[in-house]
């Protein structure tokens, strides 16, 4: 584990152990544990770890955001907004058509997301074939992927 990963693990364990109200308090706890960090680095760490402040009993403290999208979900949403041409379930598969040259990027993102219904992705230049175990799995996968498309994508003209 490298230095950044170790620091992130320590931050997460500190957040889970006790209520930390300020960045300065977190910075001091890191110091006690032998990790010296600047405020700007700590601020970036907080953002990377999806930590948010919640209000409770007239004070606020840091928690891990339970509904924060993963970086792969963010990336998929961006790709869907910029490069998706078609998304359609067909039997036990979902066909994802993209702008030329981007199908492999979609396939890599989908593989990294480890969506349970996806058995495999096979990609060409502008088509990513998403293979599922059965028709129900393909429909569930399609419904899951639809949530990453722009709001207007499936609207009727």
UniProtKB/Swiss-Prot annotation:
Alphabetized UniProt keyword annotations: Activator, Arginine metabolism, Cytoplasm, DNA-binding, Transcription, Transcription regulation
Describe which pathway this protein belongs to, using the record's wording: Amino-acid degradation; L-arginine degradation via ADI pathway
One GO-annotated biological process of the protein: protein complex oligomerization
Q: What SUPFAM superfamilies does the record point to?
A: C-terminal domain of arginine repressor, Winged helix' DNA-binding domain
Cellular localization per UniProt = Cytoplasm
Family matches, as InterPro entries: Arg_repress, Arg_repress_C, Arg_repress_C_sf, Arg_repress_DNA-bd, WH-like_DNA-bd_sf, WH_DNA-bd_sf
> Which GO MF term does the entry hold, naming one?
DNA-binding transcription factor activity
Q: Which domain of life is it from?
A: Bacteria
- A Pfam family that the UniProt record links to this protein: Arg_repressor_C
Major subcellular location class: cytoplasm
Gene Ontology CC terms, in alphabetical order = cytoplasm
Family statement drawn from the similarity comment of this UniProt entry: Belongs to the ArgR family.
- Record-linked PANTHER family: ARGININE REPRESSOR
Protein task: In the presence of arginine, coactivates the transcription of the arcABDC operon, with other regulatory proteins such as ArcR and CcpA.
Name it.
Arginine regulator
